[in-house]
Amino acid sequence: MTYQENFKKWLDFAELPDYLRKELEGMDEKTKEDAFYTNLEFGTAGMRGLIGAGTNRINIYVVRQATEGLARLIEEKGDEFKKRGVAIAYDSRHFSPEFAFESAAVLAKHGIKSYVFESLRPTPELSFAVRHLGTFAGIMITASHNPAPFNGYKVYGEDGGQMPPHDADALTDYIRAIENPFAIEVADVEAEKASGLIEVIGDAIDAEYLKEVKDVNINQKLIDEYGKDMKIVYTPLHGTGEMLARRALAQAGFDSVQVVEAQAVADPDFSTVKSPNPESQAAFALAEELGRKVGADVLVATDPDADRVGVEVLQKDGSYLNLSGNQIGAIMAKY
């Protein structure tokens, strides 16, 4: 289909939500072409794109299509896999909670169990939940460190990591085979919460995850000796890291942790940074300001879904050195 035909198909869909219809009606020709000339591609790491109306955007219909593909893959594997189900988490971006529960609603229509976090959680905790709960897969609604207009949809395998190639290829084939995402049926979320097919999770998984985080400390004796004196400034850059990072650091024995409070608020617009990328020194501006104020030894930042970390260390001249990912990796390997 041409982009004009795709656009008309969307515009003619009677049940299209008002906010999407309004967006369609305000599109110029160039935007129409970009939004409808292709489908948002689902790859091995999932998909991400601009939020909005269109086949080349991320929205409830594109999310439904991806989840419908996953549901068909699970159905093919049988009832045991439907009972094991899918763990679902989401970050602080626009529409992240809606996309998460939209995914659960599609799965529920197929009789597939889902476990959805009650509020935003980091990607590493989603991976943990997949293994802890024994689910077949995990869905993470996030666009990682992309700018605010983006969101995304990642699928994880039963080990909490990237799906193995045979499952990933099958999932992609199922998604591509769906010709009309408007025809995908969804269950009533509140009704399925009551039935137990959609289970909301939170504190109990947090506690188990934090316990495992504590248990993987390599040298607790070293932390006990020096951790209380090390001054750390942490910023979650308006993302999910705020949910657990303070608690993880405190339970490990780091007693002097200051958080950049202006960036501890979940903000889908990431208002205090140009881009929420912790590998960019520009994202550390407020952390450096607080660091100089409190005399911090180390500055730490995480991206919106808290699976990417940036670090700066205090220099003798009082400035902060921004470490590259390679430098951080080398330091960790040596340690």
Where are these regions (language model features)?
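Gly/Ser/Thr-enriched, mixed-charge loops and adjacent short helices
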Residues: 31-36, 40, 151-285, 289
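An N-terminal, well-structured beta->alpha segment
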Residues: 3-103, 192-229, 240
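N-terminal small/polar loop signature for handling phosphorylated ligands or for N-terminal nucleophile
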Residues: 87-150, 255-310
